Amino acid sequence: MKLQEFENSYQKSEQKLQFYQKKSNRLSIIRFCLFILAILVLLIGYFQKKNILYIFSFLYLLLFLYVVAVHTKVKNKLFYYDSLTKVFMQHIQRINNQWDTFEEDGEEFLKDDISIDLDLFGHHSLFQLINATFTYQGKQLLAQNIIHPSLNKDMILKRQEVLNELSEHNNFILEIQTYGKMMKIRDEETIYQFIDSLSQNHYHSMKKYIFIFPLLVLITILCCSFSIALPYSYMLCELAIVLQIIITILFYKKNSELFEPVKKFQKSLNNYQQLFLIIQNEHFQSSLLKELQAKISQNQQAVKGIEKLSRISQAISYRQNILLFILLNGLGLYDICIRYFYINWINDYGTKVQQWFDALAEMELFISLYIPKMDDFLVSQPQISDTMSLSFQNLKHPLIDTQKVVGNSFCLENHGCVITGSNMSGKTTFMRTIGMNLILSYMGSYVFGENMICSCMTILTSMRVKDNVEEGISTFYGELLRIKKMIEYSQFKKPMVCFIDEIFKGTNSLDRIAGARATIKKLSLEHCIFFMTTHDFELCNTQEIDISNYHFDEYYQDDKIFFDYLLHKGQSQTTNGQFLLKQLGII
């Protein structure tokens, strides 16, 4: 969708939001007045002994309850349009390069070398750019796919098919995002606790009493009924009530433990039901979306199951009121009844809940992969090659401002590419551009360029290497470990691509050049592509090994340095180190 479309939709949603806000405010005043009026009329009728006023008080109370029901619907609409407005705003912010303000940046996943080197997680990261998840499972699934993208061509092509279909379902995506935004809680343990609780056996604790409880309820009802006519039955009635309360207390801890997981996300159940209903009612053609939909829509089990669970969780919430708890359990073993219905629900749906939430997480993943296209970035779908290849046109860094980013074109000639150029000229950014776009390719998403052809390759990096005081690892030794990992992986003869920035910068020039030449020789294999940046021009002419030389240039104007950030063939002929030293007054 274009920016103008999002802005128009945002304005319409904002108008709806303001309309329902005003309506909600009016209804709040009306219901307050009706409640006060009902109380006042009741008190006047009581003190002035006018029974007719009791009727009016009752009518005002009924009217109050009606207004409460209407107000609840209005508040639901208000909440919906508030969430929809926020969804539109996020799309607008993403298009306007303001996406790095989004709360979720996946910093907790920033652990491995590649994630750090390629800015996959954390502030201003790939995750922060494309993330459209709203559940813990969805967030985890997206992170897993970024860290370990698929290298299966068939799966990549199936996901591309999914994204092509989603391009015709923008309203569906907006509905999913809106109800996702309405989630009350995001506690990462809540749903897992709930799912884990379903696998436990709770039935045995009440099996021996299953016939006693209904009998006690029946006795209580009969006692209460006959107590009107038979005064001596009061004692039996009281005994039955006390006995039921004792039984309730005995089972209180076990029941509370059973109900706790579902109670935690009770307020989100209606939203989950709506999400499952939206997915169930949509028409899909691609195989992955049909499989996903089948997990949810088979016999409408997800929608029906969550609807029943919502009613049970609502019943569980009444336990919070002490007076209501005593009354309901004294008259009808309320806790035991809820337990009975809940365990029946577990028996009917417990084994299916995991696949429902997994399917929802998968839909969140697909929407996240579609985000670059939906938000009108200049993207395209890559072509996956069966042979070792890498080429692209006008490929851009996904995280750089769309108004400033410069695209580059490339076609692999030799498997080894040595890149030279001045400081800040764009060498490292170019490698990150390729790395991030390859990850997007393998995830089945879009690349920020045109005509990209790539093979499925394991990505290895040596870029942001730092020393580790705790482990006693210097920067140079850290680099050695990274290079060793690449060489060891190359022995498996699986397709791989390596990105090495400023190779062996942590040691002297003599050792650096010797080590770099040895690395080039080790990685010059048919199944390996490597990109290596360096300031050592000696590496541009490596005997007996065919490598391609590329460079980035700078130019000077009015005693200032400028960069075009364009990749050029051949070895760099310029340096800017001394110029920068002079500019800063060091020399």
Name the predicted role of every residue range:
Residues 68, 369-587:
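ATPase nucleotide-binding head domains, primarily ABC-like/P-loop NTPase cores
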